[in-house]
From Swiss-Prot:
InterPro entries recorded: AMP-bd_C, AMP-bd_C_sf, AMP-binding_CS, AMP-dep_synth/lig_dom, ANL_N_sf
Protein name from the UniProt record: 2-succinylbenzoate--CoA ligase, chloroplastic/peroxisomal
Enzyme Commission number(s): 6.2.1.26
Segments crossing the lipid bilayer: 69-89, 189-209, 225-245
Gene name of this polypeptide: AAE14
GO CC field: chloroplast; chloroplast membrane; peroxisomal membrane; peroxisome
Localization: Plastid, Chloroplast membrane; Peroxisome membrane
General function of this protein: Involved in the biosynthesis of phylloquinone (vitamin K1). Converts 2-succinylbenzoate (OSB) to 2-succinylbenzoyl-CoA (OSB-CoA).
Keywords: ATP-binding, Chloroplast, Ligase, Membrane, Nucleotide-binding, Peroxisome, Plastid, Transit peptide, Transmembrane, Transmembrane helix
One annotated GO biological process: phylloquinone biosynthetic process
Top enzyme category: ligase
Family assignment from sequence similarity: Belongs to the ATP-dependent AMP-binding enzyme family. MenE subfamily.
Protease keyword on record: no
Length: 560
């Protein structure tokens, strides 16, 4: 008999089937489903998977855009004790095969956007693969090939719907394998438990204030931990899910009005797109229906925050810092609260007004520790432990990598986030940079994120990437690549008073006025014309930026 004191992500279904029985809980295009209809769909699919032969611990890979059926598959696989491994639809077939060879799925589910993967994966390419399923088909483009695949509806047919009391678990309580983006090298499969998902979802519910009356717009892909964790929080409170296949700023703004959206999550690039499109298509019109916005994946600049408040004046805007290995958010910070007229983010601390980026306080259940560097009294590695952390990287028996042991509790492991930071006297965590991304210049350590945070405070800069390049005198030289705001121009001649001009000297002066230490100020600046190269989860590919900069410089010589 199943032990129902154990956490399971499908425990949310009982609430949906009762409290939200006749209320709409999912909207996908013209398709709307009530709580009862959604739960019946999950249970029918789960029964079909059992009849097919899916067993506890079997891995199911899903490659698809966001949809109500994606949520249905996530919960149905979990219900029968399977493990879901979402594949990024932006990957090439080669990358998808690499991921599948790692996690060894028995079943591959795709929608029409990734159906070619089902077709192109030949027998023997993925030895573990037994079944291929098309999530939903409205096209005849692949009619001949699709005859060999199962469909969601086929699996639901002629099955006895199981009871909600028939949860199953994988042997180690694993439920999802999320792939890290990996700015270099191959992505790793982060294995996440039922407990981690529920713990982190409860944190979002408590801190963001999500409730059953919320209407949530899915802006983040369900292949990423941010999208999955927030989706789980909404399932638990019984909110209504409005799903777009993928993010598009113009469509998102339209859907916000049409469906009376109250909350969504974002990253700085998404918010910038929403602001730009709102300015050009809606003349900066307000949306007073949105009440909660959770930003992740990087800090919002003061300019972006100001513009966001103008568009969403009634929204409480929060920022979160987290990582895939911690099942999403570790800390939260309120950036704007419309209920407090004089609300303003303040930055007390570290004997300097701004050192790095403040990311707020840990969630109530989160343990964070800064393991101090030998040569520092306050800065060090950021470590975490608790029920939110990953079980392991898939293929490893335990979470051997990124793990440190506390000197005070030698039998309890801490997860190394890979970030460098410090706590202030109020308990706020400040990010200084990545431990593996620091620049060693003239014997001093420089963390790119700290310099970037200063640069984007200039009104003429929309984004910045700081890298280190080989220098004959300094070892590494600090170089900043900057993207300019609209109407600003780059000129290394003396600025005309009142003009929207930027130059290396004006940016160096800006850094000095922001109290950035001299050796951290970039020695050279590169104006970046296009978008910075990003991973599929929106992280900057610093190695690629460095390659392009070196190509631009051609031959590096000492700048001093």
């Amino acid at each position: 008999m199943a032990n129902h004191s154990r956490p399971h992500i499908c425990q949310c279904l009982t609430r949906l089937a009762s409290v939200k029985r006749n209320a709409v809980v999912t909207v996908y295009g013209n398709r709307k489903r009530t709580g009862r209809e959604f739960v019946d769909g999950v249970l029918s699919l789960a029964a079909g998977l059992i009849r097919l032969g899916l067993r506890n611990g079997d891995v199911v890979s899903i490659a698809a855009f966001n949809s109500d059926l994606f949520l249905e598959w996530l919960l149905a696989v979990a219900l029968v004790g399977g493990v879901v491994a979402p594949l990024n639809y932006r990957w090439s077939l080669k990358e998808a095969k690499m991921a599948m060879l790692l996690v060894e799925p028995v079943l591959l589910v795709t929608d029409e956007t990734c159906v070619s993967w089902c077709i192109d994966v030949q027998n023997g390419d993925i030895p573990s693969l037994k079944w291929r399923v098309l999530m939903e088909s409205t096209s005849t483009d692949f009619a001949n090939e699709l005859n060999q695949f199962l469909t969601t509806e086929m699996l639901k047919q002629r099955t006895l719907v199981p009871s909600l009391a028939t949860y199953a678990w994988a042997s180690d309580d694993a439920v999802v394998i999320c792939f890290t983006s990996g700015t270099t090298g191959r992505p790793k499969g982060v294995t996440i438990s039922h407990l981690a998902f529920i713990t982190q979802s409860l944190a979002k519910i408590a801190i963001a204030g999500y409730g059953e009356d919320d209407v949530y717009l899915h802006t983040s892909p369900l292949v990423h931990i941010g999208g999955l964790s927030s989706a789980m929080a909404m399932l638990m409170v019984g909110a209504c899910h409005v799903l777009l296949p993928k993010f598009d700023a113009k469509t998102a703004l339209q859907v916000m009005e049409q469906n009376h959206i109250t909350c969504f999550i974002t990253v700085p690039a998404m918010m910038a797109d929403l602001i730009r499109v709102n300015r050009t298509t809606k003349n900066g019109a307000e949306n007073r229906g949105v009440r909660k916005i959770l930003n992740g994946g990087g800090s919002l600049s003061s300019e972006l925050l100001k513009e966001a408040v103008n568009i969403f004046p009634c929204a409480r805007i929060l920022s979160a810092y987290g990582m895939t290995e911690a099942c999403s958010s570790l800390t939260f910070m309120t950036l704007h609260d419309p209920t407090q007229e004089s609300f303003k983010v303040t930055y007390p601390l570290l004997n300097q007004p701004k050192q790095g980026t403040c990311v707020g306080k840990p969630a109530p259940h989160i343990e964070l520790m800064v393991k101090l560097d030998e040569d520092s009294s306050r800065v060090g590695k950021i470590l975490t432990r608790g029920p939110h952390t990953m079980l392991r990287y898939w293929g490893h028996q335990v979470a051997q990598e990124n793990v440190e042991t506390s000197e005070s509790r030698s039998n309890e492991a801490w997860l190394d986030t890979g970030d460098i930071g410090a706590f202030d006297e109020f308990g706020n965590l400040w990010l200084i940079g990545r431990s593996n991304g620091r620049i060693k210049t003239g014997g001093e350590n420089v963390y790119p994120e700290e310099v970037e945070a200063v640069l984007v405070e200039h009104p003429g800069i929309v984004s910045a990437v700081v890298i280190g390049v080989i220098d004959t005198r300094l070892g590494e030289m600090v170089v900043a690549c900057v993207r300019l705001q609209e109407k600003w121009i780059w000129s290394d001649v003396e600025n005309r008073k009142g003009s929207f001009q930027l130059s290396s000297e004006t940016l160096k002066h800006h850094c000095r006025t922001q109290n950035l230490t001299g050796f951290k100020i970039p020695k050279r600046f590169v104006r970046w014309e296009k978008q910075f190269p990003l991973t599929t989860t929106g992280k900057v590919k610093r190695d690629e930026v460095r390659r392009q900069v070196l190509s631009h410089f051609q031959i590096m010589t000492s700048s001093l």
